[in-house]
Swiss-Prot record:
PANTHER family: DNA-3-METHYLADENINE GLYCOSYLASE
Pfam families recorded: Pur_DNA_glyco (PF02245)
Gene3D superfamilies: Methylpurine-DNA glycosylase (MPG)
Domain of life: Bacteria
Entry's family note: Belongs to the DNA glycosylase MPG family.
NCBIfam families from the UniProt entry: 3mg, PRK00802.1-3
Record key words, sorted: DNA damage, DNA repair, Hydrolase
The protein, known as: Putative 3-methyladenine DNA glycosylase
Keyword NAD: no
Amino acid sequence: MSLHSPLPRAFYAADARTVAPLLLNKVLVSADGRRGRITEVEAYCGSEDAAAHSFRGMTPRTQVMFGAPGHLYVYFIYGMHWAINAVCGGAPGHAVLIRALEPLAGCDAMHAARGAAPFKSLTTGPGRLAQAFGVSAVDNGLDLTTGVARLWIEDDGTPSPAAPLAGPRIGIRKAVELPWRWVVPGSAYLSRPLPRVSGARASVTGD
């Protein structure tokens, strides 16, 4: 039996736009002691989202996105980096990309994985945080909810922001107008500052 307390599967069993802001301030944990507080996320929403890998339906690459919520979807970006996503259950093909973390523990291991990266850039960006946590293709499909896998996400008692800042997603060419990126207000650990947009604050329900 696991002594860990991962978020339960029910937490992920909703629309990615609901789950994404609720993941802010939760903690990504590795079994070797690496820990980072989630500061930036993006929602990807299946067949209604042209920027989602799952937009055109299930493929061998995206099969995990159409399975049970609470699993890890890992993919290669820019031919050089891995990125990690939590699969959601509100509709087929929904997932939340974890874009940035604030390092909390295991920083020596993160530095070893990332080389001479400055502390503030250890985990600010999807590729950087995946490298800092040693994530690769072998982690695709990992169940985040069991507490016995090498990675999980937990609640350490820090509440999600009541009014997270929302804005357009980064590094996509389609559906660029959708404000489905959320960040912790005032965090110094973001992949990129959030531009000021009308209605930039969003409720934690995703409405």
